[in-house]
Amino acid sequence: RVIDATAMTSFRMDIWTPDPTAAPAVFKIKLVDFGANGTFAGGDDVEHEITLTAATTPALATRGWVTIDVPLSAFTGLTTRAHLAQLIFSGDPKTVYVDNVLLHR
């Protein structure tokens, strides 16, 4: 199921990890829009990934909840948002707890 996020302006979520977050640790968040055809690799997909580190704002932290609230415009490669279909996390912390994932205005 895809989400129409065209009216939304920001992405928000909270994360917590017990793992070390000092450099070179990174936590990446990718949003993917499947395009009007709603199909992965359908030729009209767009995506963008942001990277968090101990030096970014917000900063990764060990054993503390971190609120990530960023404008969707920070996902510069995400040129359309009418068919959001994937939210992908990757990075160095092996254990990450995620809560309160939402899009808002």
Residues of each region from the PLM?
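Extracellular ligand-binding interfaces
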Residues: 1-78, 92-105
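Noncatalytic modules at the cell exterior or secretory-pathway interfaces
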Residues: 76-86
